[in-house]
Amino acid sequence: MPRALILGGTGLVGRATALRLLESGWRVDVVGRDPDRMPAELTAAGGKFVEADRADQAQTRAALGSGADLLVDCLCFTAADARSLLPLAANSGSTVVMSSRAVYVDAAGRHVNSDVPPHFATPITEDRPTLAPATDTDHRSREGYGPNKVAAEQVVLESGLPVSVVRASRMHGIGASPAREWAVVKRVLDGRTILLLARRGAGIVHGTAAANLAALIETIAHRPGTRVLNCADPDAPSALEICRTIAGHLGHVWEEVLLDDTAPAGLGRTPWDSPHPIVLDTSAATALGHRPAGTYATTIAPALDRLVDAARRGRRPADADSFTEYLDYAAEDAFLARRGGSLTGGSATGPRR
C-alpha cells in the first residue's frame, strides 16, 4: 500500500487530497499541530493524524520516518520553508509543493495583490514572468506573499529532486477560508428577491476546486518530476454565472439587475469582480494526464450544502463579518427605490435559478 504524508493536511487542500488518496487505497498520514482540527471524515476514512509542527525539522523528519511515496506540502510559504523540506523530499518518491497564481505578473509588472489590478490578455501559462523572489518581506502581507512564494519555488525547483510546484488559482471547497460563496448564500438565506451585480456581472476570476487540486496531486504521485503546473477548474464562470449556480443549487429565484458604470460606486459588488479576466491555462496539467474532478458547479455543491447546514444550526463562517461590503441591503434598497421600477443604471433579466 503506497504511503502519503501531507504537511498541513487538515486544511482545505490537505483534506481533499487525503480523502481522494484514501479512496484510491493509499495510506495517508496527515500532519498538523492540533489533533482537534483533524476532519472527522478523514479519520473515518482511515487517515492517521500525526502531531508535528511544520517549522520543526526534527518533528517533520520523525513524521516522515523511513520515507513516503508521496509528500505534499501545503505550508511552504518561504525559501526557508522550502529548504527545510528538501531532506524530506529526498526520501519521497514524488513531492508536491503548493504555490499560487499570485506569483504571476502582467506586462506592466502588476499582480493579483497589486493596488492596480493586473491585465492578462490571454490565459496565464506557466512560462509567464513572475515577481522577483524576496526573503526580506513578510509572506503574510500583500506585498510579500507572491515574492516569498517565488523564492520558495526556486529553492525546490533547483534542488534536482522530483518536486512539482502546483500554482493554484482562487481556491474553493469545504473548509475554504474565506468561503467566498457566503456572499451569495447569505443573500439567499435572507430571502433577497433582487440581485444587483456591478459590471453587469462580467467579472471573471478563475477558481480552483480543492477536489481538482487533489486529482492533479494524485496524477503527480504516479508521474514524479521537476516541473511547474497550473491547476484550475475546467471552466471559468463569470460573477453572474457563479451567482446563478449558487442560487440554482439552493432552489432560490430572484430578479437580476445588471448594473453599468452609471450605478453608484460599490453597489452590486461580489468577490469575483475583476476589470479584466484572470484565467489560468491548464494545458500542461492535462498533457500530464490530469483529469479534473468536476466543474465549478459540481465541485462547489458540497461546500454550499455545508454552509447552509451550518447557518441553520446557528454557525456562520468564522470570517462572515468580512462579507458585509457585499451585503449592504440598505444601499441596494435605496437604489431600487430611487429607480422606481425603471432600469436606469442597469438592466434586468427574468427570474433565474
Task: Name every feature range the model reports, one short phrase each.
Residues 83-148, 164:
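Conserved Rossmann-fold NAD(P)-dependent oxidoreductase catalytic core, especially the SDR/UDP-sugar
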Residues 35-97, 103-106:
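NAD(P)H-binding glycine-rich loop region in Rossmannoid oxidoreductase-like domains
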Residues 150-175:
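Conserved beta-loop-beta element that borders a ligand/cofactor-binding pocket
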Residues 179-184, 197-221:
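Substrate-positioning beta->alpha
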